[in-house]
Curated annotation (Swiss-Prot):
Residues 180-382 form the Pentraxin (PTX) domain. This is Pentraxin-related protein PTX3. Glycans are attached at N221. Disulfide bonds join C180-C358, C211-C272.
């Protein structure tokens, strides 16, 4: 009888535990004796749910809180930026409306216009400052690092550019025209500084072409590039500069051709001059372009031989080394000086100032072939 009651109670407890939400483990001690035929009943011990969280639980809780704070911060920043941008749009809208009013058919008076422009200027400055603050607030650290790196690169480029300009200036001061390996340097204006030319072919000419490369440092009212003269007439042939103009004289000052505003100081310029006695045709060329022509210039004249040909000075005396005028002297550099008997064609003149200019030589005076002697402080440079 006791055993039947015990089995019935155990079965009833198992069924009750299966149908409940919380499973409780019941321990039945079948070895105990039950007095008076009654099954002892005891209340189950309640679960202690207030246990302390583990370290992993604390870590996950901290991560969740951090993500929540970051999300709230981003949301607040987005709201602030959106509000500021809306304000800026409103400001720009007011500016646009003000500009439309200023440009409308009914323009205000000068005072009102000035006041409105001042207001617009101040508003644009305020908007610019606010936009700058927004950009600073929204800038990320990688962008700041990239900006600093870009600034460093720009600074390096500025220094490189300055160095390049210095090198270019140094090279320009020593640069010679294409095909030319030497030039004659006239360091200053002096009656003792010139170069004498000694052609083998006599200078008895009824027609000629003369070309020369010029880089002048200073030009006065008359600065002689080259001159040929005799004791009887020191002005048989002259090519000289007058400030920014170039002049060709044959047989005397009455036969003079002028080309105005064609010379630039400090730069190489290729000059050519031609003359034909038969028709008195005279022409001047600058860098391959015809700049001046004339007819009836020393028509029928013949340039006599036996004179003195010089570069950088005018010979108006009887003897070498005398009769020079300091104010007529050339200062700068000259190269590629050639004289031909005959008139060159347009194409030949362009070739004379081209890539092989110093390798094209005249049949009366040829640069690099005819003897040219520097005097005073004049000297060859390379």
């Amino acid at each position: 009888m006791h055993i039947s009651v015990i089995l019935f109670c155990a079965l009833w407890s198992a069924v009750s535990a299966e149908n409940s939400d919380d499973y409780e483990l019941m321990y039945v001690n079948l070895d105990n004796e039950i007095d008076n035929g009654l099954h002892p009943t005891e209340d189950p011990t309640p679960c202690d749910c207030s246990r302390e969280n583990s370290e992993w639980d604390k870590l996950f809780t901290m991560l969740e809180n951090s993500q929540m704070r970051e999300g709230m911060l981003l949301q607040a920043t987005d709201v602030m930026l959106r509000g500021e941008l809306q304000k800026l749009q409103a400001e720009l809208g007011r500016l646009e409306g003000s500009l439309q009013k200023l440009c409308g058919p009914e323009a205000p008076s000068e005072t009102r216009l000035a006041r409105a422009l001042d207001d617009l200027l101040q508003a644009s400055r305020d908007a610019g400052r606010r936009l700058a603050r927004l950009e600073d607030a929204g800038a990320l650290r990688p962008q700041e690092e990239a900006g600093r790196a870009l600034g460093a690169v720009l600074e390096e480029l500025r220094r490189t550019r300055a160095d390049l300009r210095a090198v270019q200036g140094w090279a320009a001061s020593r640069w010679l025209p294409a095909g030319c390996e030497t030039a004659i340097l006239f360091p200053m204006r002096s009656k003792k500084i010139f170069a004498s030319v000694h052609p083998v072919t006599p200078m008895k000419l009824e027609t000629f072409s003369a070309c020369i490369w010029v880089k002048a440092t200073e030009v006065l009212n008359k600065t002689v590039l080259f001159s040929y003269g005799t004791k009887r007439n020191p002005y048989e042939i002259q090519l000289y500069l007058s400030y920014r103009s170039i002049m060709l004289v044959v047989g005397g000052e009455e036969n003079r051709l002028v080309a105005d505003a064609v010379i630039s100081l400090g730069t190489w310029t290729h000059l050519c001059s031609t003359w034909d006695s038969k028709k008195g045709h005279m022409a001047l060329w600058v860098n391959g372009d015809s700049v001046a022509t004339a007819v009836d210039m020393a028509t029928g004249h013949v340039v006599p031989e036996g004179g003195i040909l010089q570069i950088g000075q005018e010979k108006n005396g009887c003897c070498v080394g005398g009769g020079f005028d300091e104010t007529l002297a050339f200062s700068g550099r000259l190269t590629g000086f050639n004289i031909w008997e005959g008139v060159l064609s347009n194409e030949e003149i362009r070739e004379a100032g081209g890539a092989e200019s110093c390798h094209i030589r005249g049949n009366v005076v040829g640069w690099g072939v005819t003897e040219i002697q520097p005097h005073g402080g004049a000297q060859y440079v390379y």
